[in-house]
């Protein structure tokens, strides 16, 4: 909080944590946690460089090394090593897992749980549970992928349900499919 002149209700613990904060009610714990936050408010960033590059994020929780690193949005929860790392415009997402939604710049109301779940997602209203579930999805919406690598290759597919290990793994554009089992 070295540069703070008007903000109130902030907590910063760690070298350069919350350094640029001008709004209030932020908690930054860890080296460079919430380092660039200027106008964001009511955020929690815990971990080395957690929510480091975001400038105007609001109501986010980032726990883990560089979790929610680029976020300027609101209502996101990212827990894990580089979880939601490139998330810059998505909102109301829940991301739990090492590099879950790592390369996803957008996407709203997405749930990703598991190592690299929803890795490239930029779409809305998807649920990916399991390691690499919905890994390649960029614009497909309304998908449910539960299981290791389920809907893995899906890029633009919509409204699919895949439950099981590698269920509908190689589908890239097909829509409205249901697969139960490996």
Whereabouts are the PLM-identified features?
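Glycine- and small/polar-enriched repetitive beta-structure motifs of secreted/surface proteins
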Residues: 1-182
């Amino acid at each position: 909080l070295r540069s703070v002149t008007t903000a109130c209700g902030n907590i910063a613990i760690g070298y350069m944590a919350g350094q640029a904060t001008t709004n209030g009610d932020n908690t930054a714990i860890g080296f460079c946690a919430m380092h660039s936050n200027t106008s964001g408010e009511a955020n929690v960033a815990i971990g080395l460089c957690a929510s480091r590059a975001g400038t105007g994020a609001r109501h986010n929780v980032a726990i883990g090394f560089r979790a929610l690193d680029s976020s300027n949005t609101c209502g996101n929860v990212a827990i894990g090593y580089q979880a939601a790392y490139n998330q810059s415009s998505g909102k109301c997402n829940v991301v739990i897992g090492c590099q879950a939604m790592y390369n996803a710049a957008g996407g709203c109301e997405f749930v990703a749980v598991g190592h690299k779940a929803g890795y490239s997602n930029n779409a809305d209203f998807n649920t990916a549970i399991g390691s690499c579930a919905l890994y390649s999805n960029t614009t497909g919406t309304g998908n449910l992928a539960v299981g290791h690598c389920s809907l893995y290759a899906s890029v633009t597919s919509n409204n699919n349900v895949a439950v099981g290990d590698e269920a509908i793994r190689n589908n890239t554009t097909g829509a409205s499919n249901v697969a139960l089992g490996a």
